């Protein structure tokens, strides 16, 4: 090395390890409208001060590394670094705190959830100085959200395509989820749609297995859709799962669905990946297909209260990546979901502007500007007795999906669909007449069952079925 080079490298540079808080903890920082803001629940190792742990999160998820490097002098760290700008305690948790981190917009590629998550929820989650780390919420500024297409169509366009207004949409997941032949599968689809459902659905793990290859399933389901439409005079759909082992195969399945003329396809966005999902969402908008999203694998990421990522962040990411429906819990069924928290991320999916509300877990005000909304899907362990609560909790802009609650009807699939449609229409009418579904819901169902034998039979079968476990996802 020449003396000249040694001099250059040594000016303003001292090798060694610095405390992160000297550079990345900046409580005086005033956040900008263009910053991406994150709220992390941090559990540091014993002896690590909160300021150092919060600064470490900001550093490792932006420009920092474990030691000082001389190439820091070749760029403007003040322009690009993440900043831990606030720290607050977590009530009832002495070893945890919330670290608020601001990221400058230039750190992220436009229109890429993949790049956003690679930084913010990347290697930092394995950092040894932290015992656990959870991303509770993100504020996505309009300057960044406008670089995304978002949902292929959105709520209003979907209603216009289906010509269905003033009520939640009704769906059913075909069961058993695995093992049926394509023809028997199509038969179940037809019976459910003929009975009054708007949609039927592939289960998340139905792709293209030996017992039912995807092309056969698509053809028989399309036949079922057209036959049910002709008999009922209503537009029908089946969520044809295009998820595949490669993006090329996924797109081939979506193209075939479009050629069949069906209205909607489906994707498992977490197991399939954000890059694949965004590609499919763009194809769906360009070709008039609705896109149903399943969240398989989400609980691996969001179930633990002190580590991982809250589903409200995954929901925001999906709205940017693209989807017209996404599963979001039921509050009353078999799957995890506390009411206020669930409705918090339901609003983040549907609404244009959502105010900060810590009681519902919403850490930041979120302005989606003109990005279309996503219909939340309530699915998992629900039946006709849940219909009043679901109608009251989720309102009209939702999809209520009954799998076992349709196909488990003692008289068969079509009567199961009839029971659900009658229960829904009765609840919507009662609500529109000013009745309180929270208090009078069971009576509304009993009254409707007097003139619907299908509903009466369903009420008898599921009158004792409850899923009463304490929710894990609490504030």
UniProtKB/Swiss-Prot annotation:
Gene Ontology molecular function terms on file: magnesium ion binding; monooxygenase activity; ribulose-bisphosphate carboxylase activity
| UniProt-annotated binding residues for substrate | 123, 173, 177, 295, 327, 379
Active site positions, chain numbering: 175, 294
Q: Spell out the reaction equation it catalyses.
A: 2 (2R)-3-phosphoglycerate + 2 H(+) = D-ribulose 1,5-bisphosphate + CO2 + H2O; D-ribulose 1,5-bisphosphate + O2 = 2-phosphoglycolate + (2R)-3-phosphoglycerate + 2 H(+)
In this entry the propeptide is located at 1-2
Q: Please provide one cellular component term from the Gene Ontology annotations of this protein.
A: chloroplast
> What's in the keyword line of the UniProt record?
Acetylation, Calvin cycle, Carbon dioxide fixation, Chloroplast, Disulfide bond, Lyase, Magnesium, Metal-binding, Methylation, Monooxygenase, Oxidoreductase, Photorespiration, Photosynthesis, Plastid
Note the InterPro entries from the entry: RuBisCO, RuBisCo_large_chain_AS, RuBisCO_lsu_C, RuBisCO_lsu_C_sf, RuBisCO_lsu_fd_N, RuBisCO_lsu_N_sf, RuBisCO_lsuI
Name listed for the protein in its UniProt record: Ribulose bisphosphate carboxylase large chain
The protein's organism comes out as Picea pungens
């Amino acid at each position: 090395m020449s003396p000249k080079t040694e001099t250059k490298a040594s000016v303003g540079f001292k090798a060694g390890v610095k405390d992160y808080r000297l550079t990345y903890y900046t409580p005086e920082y005033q956040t900008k409208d263009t910053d991406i803001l994150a709220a992390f629940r941090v559990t540091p190792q014993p002896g690590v001060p909160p300021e150092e742990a919060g600064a470490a999160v900001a550093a490792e998820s932006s420009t920092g590394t474990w030691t000082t490097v001389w190439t820091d002098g070749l760029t403007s760290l003040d322009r690009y670094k993440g900043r831990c700008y606030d720290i607050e305690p977590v009530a009832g948790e002495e070893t945890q705190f919330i670290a608020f981190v601001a990221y400058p917009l230039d750190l992220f590629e436009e229109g890429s959830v993949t790049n956003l998550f690679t930084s913010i929820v990347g290697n930092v989650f394995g950092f040894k100085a932290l015992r656990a780390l959870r991303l509770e919420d993100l504020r996505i500024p309009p300057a960044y959200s406008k670089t995304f297409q978002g949902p292929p169509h959105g709520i209003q366009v979907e209603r216009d395509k289906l010509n269905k207004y003033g009520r939640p949409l009704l769906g059913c997941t075909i069961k058993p989820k695995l093992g049926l032949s394509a023809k028997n599968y199509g038969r179940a689809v037809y019976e459910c749609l003929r009975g009054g459902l708007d949609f039927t659905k592939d289960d998340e793990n139905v792709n293209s297995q030996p017992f039912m290859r995807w092309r056969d399933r698509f053809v028989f389901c399309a036949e079922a859709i057209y036959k049910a439409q002709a008999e009922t005079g209503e537009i029908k759909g089946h969520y044809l799962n295009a998820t595949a082992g490669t993006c090329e195969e996924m797109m081939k399945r979506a193209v075939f669905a479009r050629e069949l003329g069906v209205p909607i396809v489906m994707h498992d966005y977490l197991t399939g990946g954000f890059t694949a999902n965004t590609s499919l969402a763009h194809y769906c908008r360009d070709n008039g297909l609705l896109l149903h999203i399943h969240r398989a694998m989400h609980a691996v990421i969001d179930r633990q209260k002190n580590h991982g990522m809250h589903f409200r962040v995954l929901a925001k990411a999906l709205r940017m990546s693209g989807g017209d429906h996404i599963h979001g819990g039921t509050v009353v069924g078999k799957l995890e979901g506390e009411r206020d928290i669930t409705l918090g991320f339901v609003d983040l999916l549907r609404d244009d502007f959502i105010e900060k509300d810590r009681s519902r877990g919403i850490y930041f005000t979120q302005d989606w500007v003109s990005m279309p909304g996503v219909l939340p899907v309530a699915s998992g362990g629900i039946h006709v007795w849940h219909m009043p609560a679901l109608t009251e909790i989720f309102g009209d802009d939702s999809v209520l999906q009954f799998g076992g609650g349709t196909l488990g009807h003692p008289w068969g699939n079509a009567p199961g669909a009839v029971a659900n449609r009658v229960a829904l229409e009765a609840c919507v009418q009662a609500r529109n007449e000013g009745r309180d579904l929270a208090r009078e819901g069971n009576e509304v169902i009993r009254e409707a069952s007097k003139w619907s034998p299908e509903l009466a039979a369903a009420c008898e079968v599921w009158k004792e079925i409850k899923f009463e476990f304490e929710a894990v996802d609490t504030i």
